[in-house]
Amino acid sequence: MSNTVSLQFPDGSVREYDASMTGAALAESISKSLAKKAVAYAVDGTVRDLSDPLGASGKVEIITREDPRALELIRHDTAHVLAEAVQELFPGTQVTIGPVIENGFYYDFARNEPFTLDDLPVIEKKMREIIQRNKPFTKEVWSREKAKQVFSDKGESYKVELVDAIPAGQDLKIYYQGDWFDLCRGPHMASTGQIGNSFKLMKVAGAYWRGDANNPMLTRIYGTAFANDNDLQAYLHMLEEAEKRDHRRLGREMDLFHFQEEGPGVVFWHAKGWKMFQNLVSYMRRRLDSHGYQEVNTPQVLDKSLWETSGHWGWYRDNMFKVTVAGDDTDDDRVFALKPMNCPGHVQIFKHGLKSYRDLPIKLAEFGNVHRYEPSGALHGLMRVRGFTQDDAHIFCTEEQMAAECLQINDHILSVYKDFGFEEITIKLSTRPEKRVGSDELWDRAESVMMTVLEQIRQQSNNIKTGILPGEGAFYGPKFEYTLKDAIGREWQCGTTQVDFNLPERFGAFYIGADSEKKQPVMIHRAICGSMERFLGILIENFAGHMPLWFAPVQVVVATITSDADEYAKEAAAKLKAAGLQVVTDLRNEKINYKVREHSLQKVPVILVCGKREAEEKTVNMRRLGSRDQESMTLDEAIARLCEEATPPDLLRLKNAG
């Protein structure tokens, strides 16, 4: 076996090195300044400790703090420092697990007295002391038996349980930072000093061991960490903004919806919230019509035999709501379920009646109510519910039509997002997973088509980011995932386009080809909003409740200064309603500033104030949400202007095109 390895660098150059050379020595051989900046290195994309030997040939990269991959290392190391700090400050506390998560990390601790928010500043101070010590991260490999004995002697029963779950004979990695150590897969940076001080402990929460309510309750401490203070402060500012924009709070203030214990995870829509929901449905329905979809509706409750055929009963049953039928002897032994997805029902509609290749593509769409079980701890306002509405569509087409259909779907999705003000979109192609149906040849063709489509999208749209997610496709076919960025920089995955070879085959769906033979159609699953409830939650937070005039549930309030203007206010409101605007009249015997403030809190876009002078002159005083400016104009002028502004963007395009 050769003792040298061949390494290819990012600039394309290739050099030979001794296989036993470490990543740190490699960085040193390139330049001393790079060695000082290095926190890890990667070979063929796999991140390693700087202390690891090169071992094998491949593409090599030295990772510094500026590299996006360093962020996970920083957070991982900070979690370890958190655990050490807690055990220094609170002897007898057991450590359990502490993974990196989106935007930060957490660590779960077992302690008789749970931690509180008051403990966090003290723990943070100790963490900074540990980082200042700049102790190296060093790795040892232990046998399973040694690890179990050492953790048992330390009284770390949770670590013993983790070790027990590891297959016999498998060695374990133990990482030290000074004298403190933990069971960990790694990798880590070179020392605690490389973490820096750009971190913050955020909150505490209860968490059951292994997520099982039958197990002990632990205390989870959440934190975040960044490569520099600017990024940390930007993140903390974003959290402050997110709290102000929380759709659950705005939902209460704007009187849109509520949740209650008797219906966990399902929405009680109030009148204004339901109007907003219907505005979304109406807009999406018009967009469906303009893209050649046929709107259908499928049953809420279906026999389990259909779900067995579709495969849902086998792999999704635990997330489905089962229904027992009472009062009918013929149905006593049948098991039904609320549909978690609309796709099997759409296949049934496609199968109803003979289809020819001349009929394709057939586009079926549904605003389908679906139900999926989510643990109570995972429920989160409109963002995570148990009952919701999908803007679901399925295109049945030939393999040759697949590329054109995916491009049309992409145009449709992007134009919808643009109408709601989302300009920064990322599209990622998820490719074949290890467990999948269909031949490699079929996957090759499908992925080739979607790669071509992705490249066309990239060329046509300069502001669209694209990427590949290897192995993240559905088991039945590759898919596009659409992620949009909101007003405060958060990303939301919403739309999907998924190619499906599986479901048509399971249900025996076919069409008659040009050769008069039966052919299996390609089925493309398409969603734009995904969950319409969740999309509304995203919109509420993106606009901070200040919805565009065309989408607002109440567009105009006509408010009086004195009772002398009551009749004129009623007349003005009637004309505004006749013009198609959503109007509320406020004739209460309250001061006008009180009325304006109250309606502003409810995020009404426009308030038309009427006093005695306005009544005499047939004018209104217009005030807009978020502005102190006031503008006086005739009622007819106000109606004309507001009607123009309240025209939905799709209808405005039609009007301008005509």
Curated annotation (Swiss-Prot):
GO terms for biological process: threonyl-tRNA aminoacylation. InterPro entries: aa-tRNA-synt_IIb, aa-tRNA-synth_II, aa-tRNA-synth_II/BPL/LPL, Anticodon-bd, Anticodon-bd_dom_sf, Beta-grasp_dom_sf, TGS, TGS-like. It catalyses: tRNA(Thr) + L-threonine + ATP = L-threonyl-tRNA(Thr) + AMP + diphosphate + H(+). Its cofactor is Zn(2+). Gene3D superfamilies: 3.10.20.30, 3.30.54.20, Anticodon-binding domain, Bira Bifunctional Protein, Domain 2, Threonyl-trna Synthetase, Chain A, domain 2. Its main location: cytoplasm. It is found in: Cytoplasm. Homodimer. Catalyzes the attachment of threonine to tRNA(Thr) in a two-step reaction: L-threonine is first activated by ATP to form Thr-AMP and then transferred to the acceptor end of tRNA(Thr). Also edits incorrectly charged L-seryl-tRNA(Thr). PANTHER family: THREONINE--TRNA LIGASE, CHLOROPLASTIC_MITOCHONDRIAL 2, THREONINE-TRNA LIGASE. This is Threonine--tRNA ligase. The gene is thrS.
